[in-house]
Amino acid sequence: MTISRFHLAFPVIELESTKKFYTEVLGCKLGRQSNKWIDFNLFGHQIVAHFSPDDCIKTNTNMVDVDTVPSRHFGVILSWEKWLALCEKIKKQKVRFMIDPKIRFKDQNSEQGTFFIQDPSNNVLEFKSFKDDSMVFKK
């Protein structure tokens, strides 16, 4: 199945720390860049960090199970193996988890692994994986 790629633009406070985070921590490949923005390849999707400090604002939260989840966040649904590997990579780099890696809905059809981290501009990213990928959009 071929999946369309998404494009997401988001504000950042500063470009150099952003470049370091997305390339070194997450392993993104660099695309085009200027002195105002940087393109990244995030697991095959195009994300663009735009220098716009005034738009980097605190986000509200919602409760999901027992976690306080930022309502504004983005991320990628990975295969179980890639999710586990990314968890380990981030732990080894001593990046602070906003929400530690965990399994939600254990032993249910919608069982999923999830964790949240923040970039240097406080943009929140969630990486998750479904034990059964066919359950991503099931009710």
Task: Name each model feature, range by range.
Residues 10-56:
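Core segments of cupin and vicinal oxygen chelate
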Residues 5-12, 41, 61-139:
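Vicinal oxygen chelate
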Residues 58-62, 136-139:
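A short, polar/proline- and glycine-enriched secondary-structure boundary/capping micro-motif
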Residues 1-17, 74, 78, 129-139:
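N-terminal beta-strand motif that seeds the catalytic metal site of vicinal oxygen chelate
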Residues 30, 38-39, 63-66, 106-107:
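Short secondary-structure boundary/capping segments
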Residues 4, 36, 45, 70-72, ...:
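A generic structural signal for short beta-strands and their flanking turns/coil linkers
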Residues 52-56, 69-70, 116-123:
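Short, structured secondary-structure boundary patches
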